[in-house]
Amino acid sequence: MKRNITTALLITICSTMLGQSSFVPKSWTTSTDENGTVYRQSDGLTLYKHTKSSDHFDVYYGTGYGKTAPDKLSSSNALYVNVTDLLNKAESFYDLYVNKLKFADLSIKSKLNQYKMIICLLHDTGWTATGSGYDNTIGALWVTPSTCHPVGQTIAHEIGHSFQYQVYCDLGGYTGFRQSVGNGSTFWEQTAQWQSVQAYPDLMISQSIGLWQYNHNYAFTHEWQRYQSYWLHYYWAEKYGIDAIGRIWRGGTVSGEDPCQVYMRVFGVSVKDFFKEIYDYASRMVTYDMDAIRSYGKGSIGKYTYNYVDTGDGKLQVAYSSCPQSTGFNVIPLEVPSAGTEIQTVFTALPGGTTLAANDPAQYNNGEKYTTANVTKYNNFSEKTRRGFRHGYVALLKDGTRVYQSADTVYAKGHSTSAVNDTTTFVVPENTERLWFVVSPAPSVYIVHKWDENITNDDQWPYQLEFKNTDITGHVPYVDLSDTSIKPSDVTFDIYVGFAATTGNDYTGTTYNLTTAQLAAIGKALRIQPADIGKLMKTYSANQAKNTINLVPLNPKTNAVVNSGSTANGYGHWFSKTGNVCSWGNDSYVYSELDAGTLTFTIGQYPNHCKNGEVYQLGQGFRYKDNDGNVATAKLIFHIYIGGIPAGIEEQAYPHPLPQGKGAMFNLQGQRIGTLQKGLNIIEGKKVWAK
């Protein structure tokens, strides 16, 4: 017995000292040439036996390198690779994926204890990067030199695939997501991206945001966002630990399960609780409010596209292109009313397969662009009878605090053949900077999304919204223009903005988006649909054409139109210290430029001219000339506070005259007044400045 123990100990020590051995795939045949051993794959790829290795990787060079190894070439040569750096980085990824993310468990029978992973460095000036493995035994990757200039996130991604492949090599069964769900398994790409940005977290946003902002309403596992939709990985990792994703990859025991099904089984989560988590995840993703991503997501807060249709009866209906799938969600930006205001949302769940709203272009994003679906209804699918929704509010305060409000309620469940509505309320907190309404489906059954490149058979959960005391940011309302006897008329708005003085070459200031109420008032006054304002904009002309809008400057004393073309970029003007339109130069202090596509004003300054504490005024107007030659102007008077708007002055813009029912107005002595007076007024308990 003593002799046997000694022998076993000796074998263990020798194995440890020898380390992992090189693995030669079955598909490789061996020969030699003047430069040494040559391996030839069945597909014709030829490689030289490795000349450099590390603890866990062997590197094989394409035979095109001949006698000159890739790291012996000039660094300016396109085929040059710093192989030492490649191996060092590969070892760091190995350590991350094994010891932190737990894609392999070396304490059990793992083939990583026996063999080194394989890197095939191809002799090719093109771009190739693929990760997988050989013979269900060991992970491998195939890369060209261009992917190693420098070695970084691309190699981390492909070695991630190598470890995904390794899961099944070590555990077999239904682990490793080898079975396709439809035409493939999107979880491979999602996870490889997530793995790679664990090594390069500063890339997590740039690798995702371009498409994620358009397609987040799609299923988590949708093929058209498979490289961008790795954010649920972060939610699971925060909830269960950084090794949660590795546990999901290693946890498959049932044929054909997708990652969400494996997740629910591994962590004991019911379907109902799963969709409760999806809503919580969606709410946090509005502001990237998870520990691992919060600091990186600051610049992308709220950057989600939401397409909808104004039905003309006060309701807004989700467009086909934004209709959420069961593991997708919608982020709906809202205008921020005064603190303490109670806002209401009437949410109406529509039946699956409902006819699209009039004017819905019926488009979808295919991962590259928006294209037409050629449908007149939302998708019809068998699980539509299992309807349910979760929804609520997210507020971001000025100090960065997030406020979440939602009831633990599944709305509209079980009513699959009719529209069902509910009303939720939210009191706007003090110091709210931004506000959103979040919607995510919560059906009573989990729906597997299959990769098939066909939008029309995906599940969709349509609905309508109606708001009180707020509206969707940038909502361009529909106005009733049926009474053709009403002629265009002037309307005036006072708008208050603030920003700090600048020096050097800094011309920045702030931006201002016209509110829904302002757009509606402009449309009613000028007798045009607000959605047409940008379309009707034309370059200034003294002989303005009919059915066009010119952006014109205003006289600072009388608010009368000043006949002047643009003196700034595009539709824009520079203004002097006294508010008169001028050209760029020594007399210019502030400017305003309009983006006609978004109806956003960029308001800035001439550096070194403005001083903190000073107040400037500029006026611009949408001058509209209708088909009968009638002319009217919507006048915007911007009051610009350098250094910021003083506390106590209401930032909301009110039109002149105030809309009916806006509320009582008082002067600072508490006396009720009928019209706004110059200076400070009190409207609905708030101080408002009027010119």
Where are these regions (language model features)?
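Terminal processing/anchoring signals of secreted or surface-associated proteins
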Residues: 1, 19, 648-651, 670, ...
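Residue-level detector of functionally pivotal "anchor" positions at catalytic/ligand-binding pockets or at interdomain
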Residues: 643-672
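C-terminal tail/sorting-segment detector
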Residues: 1-3, 680-691
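Active-site-proximal alpha-helical
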Residues: 212-291
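Zinc-dependent metallopeptidase catalytic helix centered on the HExxH motif
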Residues: 139-207
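A short beta-strand micro-motif common to beta-rich folds, especially ectodomain repeats
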Residues: 611-627
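Beta/coil-rich, acidic/histidine-enriched accessory regions frequently appended to metallopeptidases
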Residues: 257-490, 496
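Zn2+-dependent metallopeptidase catalytic core
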Residues: 20-57, 61-138, 145-159, 163-167, ...
